[in-house]
Amino acid sequence: MNKIINLFISFQFLLIFHSCRKNPDPPLLTTKDVTEISYTTANSGGDVTDDGGSSIVTRGMCWSTEQEPTVQDSIITEAGELGAFTCTLTGLVPNTTYYVRAFATNVDRVGYGNEVSFTTIQNSVPVVTTAAVNSIGSASANSGGSIPSDGGLSVISRGVCWGTGQEPTVNGNKTEDGEGSGTFSSSITGLTQGTTYFVRAYATNSLGTSYGTAVSFTTLAPPVVTTASVSGLKQTSAVSGGEVVSSGGASVTDRGVCWSTSSNPTIDSGTKMSDGTGTGAFTSSMTGLTLNTTYYVRAYATNSIGTAYGSQVTFNTLKENQVADVDNNIYNTVNIGTQVWFKENLKSTRYSNGDQISNVTSSSLWQSTTSGAWRYYNDDSQYNDDYGKLYNWQAVTDSRKVCPDGWHIPSDAEWKTLEGNLGMDPFELIVTDFRGSNANVGGKLKKVDTSLWTSPNAGATDETGFSGVPGGYYNLDGTFTGIKSDGVWWSSTPAIPNTNLAYYRKLNYSNRGIYRSMPYGQMAGGGFSVRCLKD
């Protein structure tokens, strides 16, 4: 009887125990946003906040192309525990929308987080950038590129392409520099010197070819140099120079001029004068020349690519009794007694330092100007070759000097020395008006040429070699007078100190003497010829 009672009590106990036991709930969790989405992968995860009353067995992610994915779909799992976790979803298809949920399991139940959707990246051509161009030479350069993304497909070809057009393609010049993504270097060859090229990196996958941004560069070349005109002509020297207008892309290590009596001189075949480095203008002196000789000169400039030359300039050194002005007008000279004179009238448009003398053709401006000025007789350039130019008083007294270096405007006293050397009576030297007719002083100074002088050109013998010509003059009243009849030349001596009245000399076609201006001289507003006297 007691045994039956005990069994009954045990059964009741078990019945009570089982009737009191509660089934566990599913775990509680959330799904993280999807990040780092690529062509075939993405990152997500979850956060298990409640185990549902039973230990977490596993947790992970499930995903599908259909909504509300379950553990029966694609999953990734890891050991279960409370807390946050992250997983990488793999094996995805590009350009596809997926639905993903975090899940966790306990002993009896599966819990799911909220659903999150995302779309994988669509496959594309690669992404490529062009590297800077370096090691530029005359026929080659280096570049390359970087492929940060293959577009989801293997890169099967990469390199750079180049041309003179702004958007070169692989159909033109190109390099082939391997496969795959990452960085690469490329050597560009077969280029033409001094040419601007455009280069682009390229990368190709099964979808096509993409290009980086075009980068331009210019290949190196010899410098570009011009030759200056020749100036400062003398019997054994001259001045030239040039300008390096482009370095060719490389440092100019030498520049100057080279010259020879043969055409197209070089730094190897001729004589050279080196004048510095770099770009810009330069001046070169040529010395040791032979008088009365034809020379050829070229400017040169050298960089690492080579030596370039400017155009050839031809010049002649002066004969023994010649001098040149700053404009390269050449004058013959003559010794008369103790003096050396020009045999021609001055033609220069510049002072001896190179500054311009104004060409003034307005009568009012000529009268009012306080600066040096010149003009042709009758403002007609046809008179220049035979008669030279007419200058005002301000020009002949300017400190910059109208005569070439080593020469000057003769003073009244120096004109008297010339006249005395030709036999003028000493008493006449101080007289004004025409003097020295008895000694034919004027005739000895006049050129014997009735095409230049009006007949009879009285007394003309030119036995001195002075070769005076009648270039006429410009009057204070604004008129030109005396072409072919009167030659009028300035002296540097004021007729009255501290005034604008100056002495001058005149030869006339009908008089054998030479005229010295009256004591009141000539108002400085006149325009006369100039003969230069050696210092």
Residue map of PLM features:
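Compositionally biased, low-complexity segments enriched in small residues
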Residues: M1-I5, D73, V93, T192, ...
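Conserved positions within compact, well-structured domain cores
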Residues: K319-D535
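Bacterial Sec-dependent N-terminal signal peptides
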Residues: M1-P27, L318
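Alpha-helical interaction segments
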Residues: S10, T88-L89, I188, S285-M286, ...
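Short, surface-exposed linear motifs at loops/turns and structural transition points
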Residues: C20-K319
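Short secondary-structure boundary micro-motifs
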Residues: N2, C20, A102, A201, ...
